[in-house]
């Protein structure tokens, strides 16, 4: 039996990505990707999902270097769950998308050309 945990998204960055360091000196970036739905809602309008993605190390570094707000990217990754126990012993469950690969479908240069043409 093949077991699969894979997420694929294509969308636009909501803001410029920023690079941070984790406690154990790994590079990390948290991005949000705007992904329009392929169908209209009851009012005849397209909705957009804003999906949070976590990037590590070289994936994070390269995304920060080559992308900015509005860049179109492809994300290939996986879902990862975690549990955080609060002081009152209440457990909070989180599901995150961890990027394994980012494909740059537009670049900062492409975006700058679009702005200059406007």
Mark where each language-model region is.
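Conserved short histidine dyad/triad with adjacent acidic residue
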Residues: 13-16, 55
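Short, acidic/hydrophobic/Gly-rich beta-strand patch recurrent on exposed beta strands
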Residues: 30-35, 52-55, 95-97
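Disulfide-stabilized netrin-like
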Residues: 46-59
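A generic structural motif
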Residues: 34-40, 85
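OB-fold and OB-like beta-barrel modules that bind single-stranded nucleic acids
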Residues: 7-13, 33, 69-81, 99-102
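Structural motif
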Residues: 6-8, 28-30, 48-50, 72-74, ...
């Amino acid at each position: 039996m093949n077991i699969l945990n894979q997420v694929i998204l294509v969308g636009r960055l909501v803001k410029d990505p920023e690079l941070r360091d984790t406690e154990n000196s790994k590079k990390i970036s948290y991005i949000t990707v705007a992904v329009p739905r392929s169908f209209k809602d009851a009012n005849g309008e397209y909705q957009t999902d804003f999906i949070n993605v976590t990037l590590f190390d070289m994936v994070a570094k390269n995304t920060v270097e080559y992308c900015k707000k509005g860049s179109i990217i492809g994300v290939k990754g996986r879902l990862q769950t975690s549990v955080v126990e609060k002081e009152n012993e209440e457990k909070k469950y989180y599901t995150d998308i961890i990027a394994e690969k980012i494909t740059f479908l537009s670049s900062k240069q492409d975006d700058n050309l679009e702005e200059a043409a406007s």
